[in-house]
């Protein structure tokens, strides 16, 4: 499969780590969220408890770091591969220490390659939720 969305559309329903092969890219392991808002989301950053240092150098962000079962950054090269060949929606979920949950969705999310310093492109805020 090319993406978590493709896995979801083909009957995979469990959250977890999967191997995908995005168009024109090498196979990568990703964490797929198959339960949030219909499922099929690729998680590219997760912060839980501060167990992983995110104050790292450019090369670490380029290649990715951490552990998909805990805190991690998937890697800028992988993000470019995931967003380069087709439209991708971005959803950002946040939860504070009191359990207050917020999210925002963008209809278009792109990450440029390393030559363009992984420039982020966002368009079209689709939905926002802030719970009291």
Describe the role of every protein-language-model region:
Residues 1-132:
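Extracellular beta-rich globular recognition domains, centered on the fibrinogen C-terminal
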């Amino acid at each position: 499969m090319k993406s978590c969305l493709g896995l979801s559309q083909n009957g995979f329903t469990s959250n977890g780590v999967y191997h995908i092969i995005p168009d024109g890219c090498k196979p990568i392991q990703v964490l797929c969220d198959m339960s949030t808002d219909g499922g099929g989301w690729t998680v590219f950053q997760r912060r839980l408890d501060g167990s992983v240092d995110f104050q790292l150098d450019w090369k670490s962000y380029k290649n990715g770091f951490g552990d998909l079962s805990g805190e991690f950054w998937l890697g800028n090269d992988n993000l470019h591969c995931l967003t380069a060949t087709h439209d991708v929606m971005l959803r950002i979920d946040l939860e504070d220490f009191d359990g207050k949950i917020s999210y925002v969705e963008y209809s278009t999310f792109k990450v440029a390659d390393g030559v363009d310093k992984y420039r982020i492109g966002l368009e079209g805020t689709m939905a926002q939720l802030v719970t009291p």
